[in-house]
Amino acid sequence: MTFRAASDQIEVPAGVGLTAVGMAWVRARESARRDRLFDDPYAEAFVEAAGGPAAAGPAGAFARFIDVVDSHGVQRTRFFDDYLTRAADAGQRQFVLLAAGLDTRAHRLSWPAGTRLFEVDLPEMLTFKQAVLDTRHATARAERITVPADLAGDWSSALTRAGLRPRERTTWLVEGLLPYLDAEAAAHLLTTVGELSVPGSLLGFEYQADTWLLDELRATPELAEFATLLKGGLGESPLDWLPRHGWQVLQARLRSELAAEAGRPAPGPLADGFLVATRR
């Protein structure tokens, strides 16, 4: 899947940031279904601003890759929608989305009064996102605080300067990020999250239990460049890593399980999933 800029007035994110446009395309397609699992009324606007999707490459491995991305993106979005909603219903009022990308949950989910939602991402991503949201006159349903920061740098200082209250419980979402980090960087990021989290804080992220997807990408010439962006994440099961670092896993669900419950197919590997943990 490739995207081209539709206008010189809005700069489209590049590199890993471009994958956020791809996920917006997945959400736009799902939102157009009569049996949709969620509704993102802004997703299509991001795709349009990027010039629209254009399929690249032959059938076969590429087609299977697109199907897996679509399935993963749909189930991931619904799972974490429910995760954030349940946290808010349980009294959590401080939320942080790391690598927020083109996430529009601040605008499309219902939030209790007093909710503060921090979106951390690169300045160019946040600028693109806001420019598109402005064209749709989008209004956030919670106090939305954008934090321009590189997650490879000292993002925690930027977050606290923006108003994060580390002594309060925080609900963290690390969505679509860890696969683009190597084991050391992924562990460092999650360790930093832990240092900013008091007991009762929550953490949600996705996990991949095998290398099928990366192997498939590397074996497909049209996708080899994208494959270089993927670093593998933690390198071990988060079900083992989290308990050693002060977290208790509350929920871990495979994509295939969620898809079956929704009456949807689950193409590709069956070992990817999503989890929620709480700080001990």
Swiss-Prot record:
GO terms for molecular function: methyltransferase activity. It comes from the Bacteria. Keywords: Methyltransferase, S-adenosyl-L-methionine, Transferase. It is an enzyme of class 2 (transferase). Gene3D superfamilies: Vaccinia Virus protein VP39 (3.40.50.150). Its EC number is 2.1.1.-. One of its GO terms (biological process) is methylation. Belongs to the UPF0677 family. Exhibits S-adenosyl-L-methionine-dependent methyltransferase activity. This is Putative S-adenosyl-L-methionine-dependent methyltransferase FRAAL3836. It comes from Frankia alni (strain DSM 45986 / CECT 9034 / ACN14a).
